[in-house]
């Protein structure tokens, strides 16, 4: 039997927390949390800035007690702020991330990494360093090369090294990929190391598969035109069937992307559900 025969043929992705909201009874915050469901497993990708994702999940009739894995994209507080609340709620899930996620992080002078990271029970964590198949059809990409230096988003961010701060190049960042064996979808929370760099890395792993969905934040809401143009130009020759933007992409850049690529581009607001296929 081909191992790809075990890959899920259906994925459901629900945005539990994001900057915007339209659904009645839901709330928004500056952060991101995605719920991913296959016929056999349930995952969480980031926890937003607070426990809001838990409250929104309840409104959406999603039981987070059943989540098998929590994948953390990087250490910023708007993606890990609900970590403590999740670990209290769910006693069984394994947390998967890079070990450098616990490094102290800053935006300018303000600390914005994992809150009270020293109090977290790391026995529940699984640290990854290289491409990893977490579950059949679900891959982690923690090794993102900086092939396009223009499409990087490090400005104003720092990380603590020994006793001093240095510019943060986001060694802790990781992307999540879902595949059914014939097409792949990329979930990237903030893309500090560049969404086009992430795509190139995933393309190396799945060179013959179709590019089904690109979902997440591109960190271009305040970016200069050169950075936006670098991404748009890349999509001209390698564009997924659907681009679901959110969070740090910015509504203005969402509108610009839609001008370029039309109905392929949608906004991934709080409460939105995307199904694959």
Question: Where does each model-flagged region fall?
Answer:
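Conserved beta-strand hairpin/beta-sheet module of binuclear metal-dependent hydrolase folds
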Residues: 9-60, 169, 173-188
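Cap/insert and terminal regions of metallo-dependent hydrolase folds
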Residues: 76-79, 167-185, 190-270
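Active-site metal-binding loops of divalent metal-dependent hydrolases
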Residues: 17-20, 47-50, 75, 100-101, ...
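Metallo-beta-lactamase
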Residues: 100-174, 266-277
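Structural motif
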Residues: 11-14, 42-43, 69, 93-94, ...
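Conserved N-terminal glycine/acidic-rich loop preference
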Residues: 42-45, 64-67, 79, 104-129, ...
């Amino acid at each position: 039997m081909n191992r790809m025969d075990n890959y899920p043929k259906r994925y459901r992705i629900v945005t539990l927390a994001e900057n915007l909201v339209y659904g009645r009874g839901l709330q928004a915050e500056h952060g991101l949390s995605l719920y991913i469901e296959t016929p056999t497993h349930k995952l969480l990708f980031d926890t937003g800035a607070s426990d809001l994702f838990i409250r929104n999940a309840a409104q959406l009739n999603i039981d987070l007690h059943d989540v098998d894995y929590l994948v953390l994209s990087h250490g910023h507080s708007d993606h890990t702020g609900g970590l403590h609340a999740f670990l209290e709620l769910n006693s069984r899930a394994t947390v998967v991330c890079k070990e450098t996620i616990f490094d102290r992080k800053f935006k300018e002078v303000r600390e914005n990494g994992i809150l009270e990271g020293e109090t977290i029970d790391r026995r529940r964590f699984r640290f990854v360093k290289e491409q990893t198949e977490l579950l059949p059809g679900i891959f982690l990409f923690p090794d993102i090369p900086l092939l396009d230096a223009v499409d990087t988003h490090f400005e104003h961010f720092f990380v603590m090294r020994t006793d001093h701060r240095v510019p943060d190049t986001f060694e802790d960042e990781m992307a999540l990929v879902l595949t059914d064996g014939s097409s792949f979808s990329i979930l990237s929370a903030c893309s500090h190391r560049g969404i086009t760099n992430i795509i190139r890395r995933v393309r190396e792993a799945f060179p013959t598969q179709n590019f089904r969905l690109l979902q997440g934040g591109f960190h271009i809401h305040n970016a200069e035109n050169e950075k936006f143009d670098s991404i748009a130009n890349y999509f001209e020759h390698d564009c997924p069937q659907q681009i679901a933007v959110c969070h740090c992409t910015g509504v203005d850049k969402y509108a610009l992307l839609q001008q370029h690529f039309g109905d392929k581009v949608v906004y991934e607001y709080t409460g939105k559900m995307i199904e694959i296929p």
